[in-house]
Swiss-Prot record:
GO molecular function: rRNA binding; structural constituent of ribosome; tRNA binding
Superkingdom of origin: Bacteria
Source species of the chain: Bifidobacterium adolescentis (strain ATCC 15703 / DSM 20083 / NCTC 11814 / E194a)
A Gene Ontology term for the protein's cellular component: ribonucleoprotein complex
Stated name of the protein: Large ribosomal subunit protein uL5
Assigned keywords, A-Z: Ribonucleoprotein, Ribosomal protein, RNA-binding, rRNA-binding, tRNA-binding
Record note on quaternary structure: Part of the 50S ribosomal subunit; part of the 5S rRNA/L5/L18/L25 subcomplex. Contacts the 5S rRNA and the P site tRNA. Forms a bridge to the 30S subunit in the 70S ribosome.
Lineage: Bacteria, Bacillati, Actinomycetota, Actinomycetes, Bifidobacteriales
Length: 190
């Protein structure tokens, strides 16, 4: 007779580090009495604006393909709300794509971003630590998609940048910065 036990999926490495090391450290640092008060990452939004898609609608397909490879999730396409003649833009035309990551996929993406993608940037000296929005959320941009190992450098048709928003449960920028620093975000020291 064969053993039919099913193993639970492995917990993402960064999530495990957060639960076992970071929560107790932040609890002490901010004098919380309950671990549920500690700030946590709620979601990560990865978006690509493809302004040139106003002239060539095929470009949006490349952005969707790249985002799917990078995040492991199918992106939602954003469309123009208004027509703007100067930009050759019509209402309802596809001009970008975004993915909202939560749960296990979010932790896996953050781990890959921090350990593999950011170190691959040429002349990388850290990310700007001033881009918090006043609500505890952090935004930063990347100039090209080739830093992710999922993207084959030979198959890139256009260089596309992307914006990444990390939404935290705290409303305090200082606390959010400490959380992200503990997670491994390489902020520039001023």
């Amino acid at each position: 007779m064969t053993d039919t036990t099913v193993e639970a999926p492995a917990t993402p490495r960064l999530k495990q580090k957060y639960n076992e090391q970071i929560v107790p450290e932040l609890e002490k640092e901010f004098h919380y009495s309950n671990p549920m008060q500690v700030a946590r990452v709620q979601k990560v939004v990865v978006s690509m604006g493809v302004g040139a898609a106003a002239r060539d609608s095929k470009l949006i397909e490349g952005a969707v393909k790249d985002l799917t490879l990078i995040t492991g999730q199918k992106p939602k396409i954003t469309k123009a709300k208004k027509s703007v003649a100067q930009f050759h833009l019509r209402e309802g035309q596809a001009i970008g794509a975004y993915v909202t990551l939560r749960g296990e996929r979010m932790w896996e993406f953050l781990d890959r971003l921090l350990t593999m993608a950011l170190p691959r940037i040429r002349d990388f000296r850290g990310i700007n630590g001033d881009q918090f929005d006043g609500q505890g959320n952090y935004n930063f941009g990347l100039t090209e998609q080739s830093m992710f190992h999922e993207i084959d450098p030979d198959s890139i048709d256009h260089q596309r940048g992307m914006d990444i928003t990390v939404v935290t449960s705290t409303k305090d920028d200082k606390e959010a910065r400490v959380l992200l620093k503990h997670l491994g975000f390489p902020f520039k020291e001023n």
